[in-house]
Amino acid sequence: MAQLYFYYSAMNAGKSTALLQSSYNYQERGMRTLVFTAEIDNRHGVGIVSSRIGLSSPALLFNRQTSLFELLEKEHRTQPVDCVLIDECQFLTREQVNELSDVVDQLDIPVLCYGLRTDFRGDLFSGSHYLLAWADKLIELKTVCHCGRKANCVLRLDAQGNAVHEGEQVVIGGNESYVSVCRKHYKIALGLTRKESV
């Protein structure tokens, strides 16, 4: 029975690496996968899922207007699809997450979504919000803060390397713009810590 999976983490936890490995595992068994990535994420080229360790794969693009169920139903009728993998799933809309649940429930195709849970302000992305609510399986991929604790927050950095807490939710960037940290160091960087009482 197919399920909807949400693999989430802060940045640089190996989400794209895990996605590419999962796709390879299916393909190695002669199964067909379809890999998607967000149209707005062009850090490594358009229509490419790329990992920091050098793995990459061509990918179909989605944007806010893409009807994923319609596209996948058509693909599946043409040639059966064994697994759908979505990179940068935080950029999905509520309707697209609903459509992916229909791909699982009506077409019986497993859907594996990989993305960030929260933005640099600590707020959920739309796609992450609905995946946390509707996914059958939630899997946290872990990365490490500079202090050694689990990093579960993302800091956005300005051109001088200072943490910022204001601005557009989506600004595409890599290690020059974002760093994953633990909650304690997130609060320290943004000046959100409580003063110790004497």
From Swiss-Prot:
Its EC number is 2.7.1.21. It catalyses: thymidine + ATP = dTMP + ADP + H(+). It comes from the Bacteria. The keyword Cytoplasm applies. Zn(2+) binds at C145, C147, C182, H185. ATP binds at S9, A10, M11, N12, A13, G14, K15, S16, D87, E88, C89, Q90. Gene3D superfamilies: 3.30.60.20, P-loop containing nucleotide triphosphate hydrolases (3.40.50.300). Its main location: cytoplasm. The keyword tRNA-binding does not apply. One of its GO terms (biological process) is DNA biosynthetic process. Keywords: ATP-binding, Cytoplasm, DNA synthesis, Kinase, Metal-binding, Nucleotide-binding, Transferase, Zinc. It is an enzyme of class 2 (transferase). One of its GO terms (molecular function) is thymidine kinase activity. It is found in: Cytoplasm. Homotetramer. Belongs to the thymidine kinase family. This is Thymidine kinase. It comes from Pectobacterium atrosepticum (strain SCRI 1043 / ATCC BAA-672) (Erwinia carotovora subsp. atroseptica).
